[in-house]
Amino acid sequence: MTVAADLPYFDHAVPLPIAHRGGALYEPNVGLENTRYAFANAVDLGYRYLETDVHASRDGVVYAFHDSSLDRVTDRSGRIAALGADQVGRARIGGREPIPTLAELFEAFPDARFNIDVKEASAVEPTARLVRSTKTHDRVCLASFSVDRIRRLRRLLGPRVATSMGTAEVVQLRSPIGFFRRLAARCGASCVQVPHRVGRLTVTTPDFVAEAHRFGLQVHVWTVNDVPDMIELLDLGVDGIITDRIDALRDVLMARERWDGAPG
């Protein structure tokens, strides 16, 4: 069983402040999510942990981008997986910023940690190859809703790389049956990343957080943009908060003397 305390990725004091897509609702970043500009703004605020999603182009280049297609936030159209890197490279987010490759982000922010949601099966092997070739095993935590994808990533990269649980593994961890909770804890994950609530269901109950901690798992909660929720979760003892409102989370943590980021 891989526990968070064993991995260099988690070498920061908890709670980890994690910039979702670079801080998509931070005023300078609005309309420029997942750009090098947005990530630089998060780093300037003192963030060390940056969240992004990845897709791979037709020729295997890994891009930091949320959607499967370019249509919503760029001046181009088409599915990334069906386009070559030369085509993806011409797209501009918000009409101005290029879509960064994951390799470019690794190089641009050498002190940052990256929480990476691998969005499609076609991006699994290119992402694993990139982590190996850049020797960034200690700087990434890989995530996916898909258990199949996250298991493939664990097989390709081994236990030295942090991973979160897939959805089915989280369901097992929430089971009232101890056997299934223990089974989930042995999946190879080092953290669990969940929403605070799904509809009327509260996911991050005190019992759930305590059970995750009992198995050595960190609990990170997404995507938390309301200050009262941030305060509630910090009181609950979660280990990380993923937010679009990076300035608000920073202020909350500073007020509680829990901000451990670089000066910004």
Residue locations for each model-derived region?
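Phosphate-group recognition and catalysis centered on beta-loop-alpha active-site segments
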Residues: 1-264
